[in-house]
Every structure is written in structure tokens, then in C-alpha cells.
């Protein structure tokens, strides 16, 4: 039987330092008979030499286009714009199955080349629950940035750091009045919500946690009565949003949105008051200037779509620990394990919908 070949590509996004598989987990794949190739990367938080020492084959940056046809190409964020046709099996977060911006172009590239997109977001168990995610650290960083902004201690541009440095900033925020804030975490019991809660506790911020029951019957005034909203809700079907433009003119305490989910361009956006991401260089954008006579404060948003990369080492280690056992499932005798089959079905459905809509 031909060994499964996993090819860990470099990331094309300049601020992306995470890795889907860390050096410490490479031997687990090699011991299972896998072939592991790692591209050189000047920005990855783990040195290429660490992968070589773990037994991986090292190749040049961006050479995945010449990888063997049967290789699984692993990454984190979007592919570069070239080539126009994709013929490998790619594993990464594509954000292309819910009508997001550029989704059609991404799917077209796979359709032209005959490749397949196994989106990590759609690796799910038999109950439909995601089995791999960066959610905890996304929530942690998103909530942390919200607190720092509210206490006037957020400094741009942002850059990656170890967790102890971020925690020191949160502790300082706690001494700068964070305990007087009120924070609301939607999706508070999920991975991202738990991470957000942990960061807020570190800063000493009182936290309200809403989950499905509380958000199903939304209490809009209660939501507006918090200083910080950390949105950690992911939905695959359009539903009633938490905050709409008309809400911003009402009397409110709310001053900062930290949109961890960051599904800003699709129909499942739970915060349609914002339709653009923010960046490491400009992490905060003003959404509403406020109106003192109506009791409305200025409202700002933080909507960074790769939050965990601000803590790249911790985020990668946790993610790799979750993903590596499922990579082993690619070599099961009866074919790839259930989560990979689920991701494959999601891709097939997205392509069928593209063809049904008249995509070229």
C-alpha cells in the first residue's frame, strides 16, 4: 500500500506564523508509515531545522505546486492566487462553503484542476461537531484585545508574542480599571467562548456568558448593557443577528465589539453592523461615532481573521495535538475516517451549488 504523503506548505500570508503540525508530532506520522514533507518558511514559529531533526523531508518554500499528485497539502490560511487551477487535495481553512467573499473563485480553482478542498472547519464527527479548531486561542486573543482597547492600552501594529507577555498586558489592564468593565461572550460554552472567558478572568473583567438558550431568545437591551461584546458564535445557516445598524442609535453601554468568529462577508454574519475585517496594522475601526444626547457611546470593532497567530506557538501546539490523530485516519484500510468523509461531502455539496448557480 502506498504510504500517505502529508506535505506541510509555507503560508503566503505575511502575518501567519502558525503550523498545522508541529515538529514534536511529526514522529507520530512517520511511525505510522506516513511520508512527511515540510516546506521551508522564514516566518513559521517553528524553525525548519526542528522539522528536519524530527525526520521530515525539507523542500523549498512554495514547492507544493510540484508535489506528487496523491499528496495531501496542509496549511492554515488561504492559498496564494497562483496557480489558477488546483489539482491536489488541500487541507486548510478556506472559508469558501458559506457564500463568503471570494468563495466562488476558490471553488472554481479546484473545479478547473480536479483537486479537492478538505476544509478543516468541516472535519466533523458523526454528530456534526467539529473535531479540530483553533477556537480556544482565537477567543482568548480576541477578548484580550477588546480589554486592552477599552483600557487604552492596545498598541498597534500588533505582533506575535508568547502567552506570558499577553497575560502581563492583561494584568496591567486589570490595574487600569478593567474590573469596572462588563463583558458579554456569546457562544460562551464553546471552544472560543471558553478561551474568551479565560482571558477576561485573567484581566479581572466581570463576564456574562450566553450560549444557545440565551441567544435563541435574544435580550437586546441586556446585550447593549455591556462594555464589550465578544462574539464566538458560528452558524452555518442565516439566523437573527445579534446587532443590526438600527441598534446602534439606541441608548447603550456597548463600546467595543471583538468579533472572534469574523464571518464578515457572508450571509451568516451575526454582527452585520460590520462587513470588513481589521488587520494587525490597524486592529480597531470606528463603526459608530456615538451621540451623547442619546446616550450612545462611540462603537469600535476588532475583526481580525487570524487571531490565534498572535500566540502562534501555543495555538499551533494545541491544534497539532488535535489534528495529528485525525491525519492518521487518512490511512485507515477502509478509506479515510468519518471526519474526512464529512469534509469531502461538504466540498462536493459546495461545488454542486456552484454549478447549480451557473458558475463558470
Predicted regions and their residues:
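Phosphate/diphosphate ligand-binding glycine-rich loop within oxidoreductases
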Residues: 71-153
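Rossmann-like adenosine-cofactor binding region
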Residues: 212-295
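An N-terminal-biased, well-structured beta-alpha scaffold segment characteristic
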Residues: 2-109
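Glycine-rich phosphate/diphosphate-binding loop of Rossmann-like nucleotide-binding domains
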Residues: 10-41, 153-234
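Phosphate-coordination loops involved in phosphoryl transfer and adenosine-cofactor binding
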Residues: 3, 87, 179-182, 254
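Short glycine-/small-residue-rich Rossmann-like dinucleotide-binding loops
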Residues: 77-78, 94-95, 233-238, 261-262, ...
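Adenosine-phosphate binding glycine-rich loop
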Residues: 116, 121-171, 262-360
Amino acid at each position: 500500500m502506498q504510504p500517505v504523503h502529508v506535505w506541510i506548505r509555507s503560508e503566503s500570508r505575511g502575518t501567519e506564523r502558525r503550523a498545522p503540525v508541529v515538529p514534536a508530532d511529526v514522529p507520530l506520522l512517520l511511525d505510522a508509515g506516513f511520508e512527511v514533507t515540510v516546506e521551508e518558511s522564514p516566518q513559521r514559529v517553528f524553525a525548519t531545522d526542528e522539522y528536519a531533526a524530527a525526520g521530515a523531508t525539507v523542500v523549498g518554500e512554495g514547492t507544493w505546486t510540484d508535489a506528487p499528485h496523491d499528496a495531501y497539502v496542509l496549511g492554515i490560511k488561504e492559498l496564494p492566487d497562483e496557480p489558477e487551477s488546483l489539482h491536489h487535495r488541500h487541507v486548510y481553512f478556506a472559508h469558501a462553503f458559506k457564500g463568503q467573499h471570494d468563495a466562488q473563485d476558490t471553488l472554481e480553482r479546484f473545479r478547473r484542476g480536479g483537486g479537492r478542498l478538505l476544509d478543516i472547519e468541516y472535519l466533523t464527527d458523526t454528530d456534526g461537531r467539529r473535531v479540530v479548531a483553533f477556537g480556544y486561542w482565537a477567543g482568548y486573543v480576541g477578548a484580550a484585545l477588546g480589554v486592552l482597547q477599552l483600557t487604552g492600552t492596545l498598541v498597534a501594529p500588533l505582533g506575535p508574542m508568547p502567552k506570558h507577555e499577553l497575560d502581563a498586558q492583561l494584568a496591567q489592564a486589570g490595574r487600569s480599571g478593567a474590573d469596572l468593565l462588563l463583558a458579554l461572550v456569546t457562544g460562551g460554552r464553546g471552544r472560543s467562548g471558553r478561551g474568551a472567558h479565560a482571558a477576561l478572568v485573567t484581566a479581572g473583567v466581570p463576564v456574562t456568558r450566553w450560549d444557545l438558550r440565551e441567544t435563541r431568545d435574544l435580550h437586546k437591551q441586556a446585550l447593549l448593557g455591556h462594555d464589550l461584546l465578544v462574539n464566538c458564535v458560528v452558524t452555518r445557516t442565516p439566523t437573527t443577528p445579534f446587532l443590526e445598524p438600527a441598534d446602534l442609535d439606541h441608548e447603550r453601554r456597548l463600546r467595543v465589539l471583538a468579533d472572534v468568529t469574523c464571518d464578515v462577508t457572508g450571509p451568516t454574519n451575526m454582527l452585520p453592523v460590520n462587513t470588513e475585517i481589521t488587520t494587525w496594522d490597524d486592529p480597531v475601526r470606528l463603526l459608530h461615532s456615538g451621540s451623547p444626547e442619546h446616550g450612545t457611546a462611540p462603537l469600535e470593532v476588532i475583526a481580525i481573521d487570524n487571531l490565534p497567530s498572535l500566540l502562534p506557538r501555543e495555538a499551533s501546539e494545541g491544534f497539532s495535538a488535535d489534528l495529528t490523530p485525525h491525519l492518521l485516519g487518512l490511512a485507515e484500510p477502509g478509506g479515510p475516517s468519518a471526519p474526512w468523509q464529512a469534509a469531502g461531502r461538504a466540498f462536493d455539496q459546495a461545488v454542486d451549488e456552484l454549478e447549480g448557480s451557473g458558475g463558470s
